[in-house]
Amino acid sequence: MIIEIFYQTRKCFVPRMNCADEVSMTNFHSDEYDDIHCSLKSFEEAFAFFEQLERNGDVKSYCNGANKSGRWIFQIYSTEFVEELAAVINRALGRRRKTPPVLEIMSGDGRLTEFLQPLVKRHCIATDSRDGRYNIGYPKWVETLDAMDAIAKYSPSFIIMCWEPYLSMTGIEIVKMGIPVAWIGNPNMCGHTDIFDRYHIPLESKFALSRHDIFMEKEFKTDVFFFNCKPKWI
């Protein structure tokens, strides 16, 4: 079944913050913008931040490291987004006696794993091949492993993939293994579209934000897609 809904853009209502709230979350008069992922913000705060960046014409440069931490940003995390992802992972884990870890592959700087760990009832491990494609600052605790080697090493109970490289076939090979997977990204710009020929369940998240969105038009282009997962977990 080929996904169709996300080949178009997703639109939803986003509440407006007042001006005081918008200004307090960042200093738009400084030489560099604050790092939105320095700590986890609410969806409303994150949306307002990027709406202002878009007004200034700075979304692309900001996401390419023009912020106080020099952080590259692809998916934009918020409290609500992380909480709903963690809830699905916890339901998938259930009450199993065995405790293999949750594994994030292609994790970049591992920020999603950091945000998820306090909410997930299993040890979370972040890995990345560090292939030099982007100028990402990798913390030492992000283990240098490509996706297949990481899976072979840790035999995870659940796998997270966020912004798989465009036209990569790795996601398809991983889904074929039968391990529960959360695939996060823009179906038109991440991974290979053939992955959606396999059975999957979209989260249809109201809180998914990314660098590709058109914030002032409230057009959002990413979601979480679950493979090898039961509908009752979502």
Regions found by a protein language model. Give the residues of each.
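Rossmann-like AdoMet/SAM-dependent catalytic core
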Residues: 222-226, 230-234
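A short SAM/SAH-binding and catalytic strip from SAM-dependent methyltransferases
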Residues: 157-168
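S-adenosyl-L-methionine
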Residues: 2-93
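Conserved SAM-binding loop of SAM-dependent methyltransferases across substrates and taxa
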Residues: 111-119
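Short, polar loop motifs at secondary-structure junctions
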Residues: 110, 128-133, 166, 186-189
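Conserved class I S-adenosyl-L-methionine
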Residues: 100-108
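C-terminal substrate-binding/active-site "lid" region of AdoMet-derived donor-dependent transferases
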Residues: 167-225
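Adenosine-cofactor binding site in Rossmann-like domains, unifying the SAM/SAH pocket
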Residues: 125-153
